[in-house]
Swiss-Prot record:
Species, as recorded: Salmonella typhimurium (strain LT2 / SGSC1412 / ATCC 700720)
Subunit structure: Interacts with DNA gyrase.
The protein, known as: DNA gyrase inhibitor
PANTHER family: DNA GYRASE INHIBITOR, TRANSCRIPTIONAL REGULATOR YGIV-RELATED
Record-level Gene Ontology MF annotations: DNA topoisomerase type II (double strand cut, ATP-hydrolyzing) inhibitor activity
Compartments reported by the entry: Cytoplasm
Annotated HAMAP family: DNA_gyrase_inhibitor (MF_01896)
A Gene Ontology cellular-component term: cytoplasm
Taxonomic lineage from the root: Bacteria, Pseudomonadati, Pseudomonadota, Gammaproteobacteria, Enterobacterales
Coiled-coil regions listed: none
Record bears the keyword Lipid metabolism: no
Family: Belongs to the DNA gyrase inhibitor family.
Function text: Inhibits the supercoiling activity of DNA gyrase. Acts by inhibiting DNA gyrase at an early step, prior to (or at the step of) binding of DNA by the gyrase. It protects cells against toxins that target DNA gyrase, by inhibiting activity of these toxins and reducing the formation of lethal double-strand breaks in the cell.
Entry-linked Pfam families: GyrI-like
Amino acid sequence: MDYEIRQEQKRKIAGFHMVGPWEHTVKQGFEQLMTWVDRQRIVPVEWIAVYYDNPDVVPAEKLRCDTVVSVAENFILPDNSEGVIVTAIEGGEYATAVARVEDRDFAKPWERFFDVLEQDSAYQIASAPCFETYLNNGMEDGYWDIEMYIPVQRK
């Protein structure tokens, strides 16, 4: 898997914080997010899932994620936005890779990316959330093209 190290800017995000098994909460969170975006006529810059925990360490029922859209820096949360959070993904150095997700198996490209990145001689994984952006509408296309972001720091 090819990847590159990039400096990313801080992203302001709005959406839903979810807790539980990612195979359920991410789908549920994006359903809620789509409803809110449509109802509020939000024009998202990006659709993003943010992952806070290591599923090899944290029990599935305690896994945390955010299903969000990136918004302009001057974004103000509209009325009738119950349950919506506004927060940020911090800027910094990230390893990034693009992958295609088929059969809804989002774990496979992430596992491959982590395995490859752990072999990097110059960078190590930093203690911060990972995230993915969606490059297409997988509900329409039957597959998802995603860009994965893992925070890194020099060894």
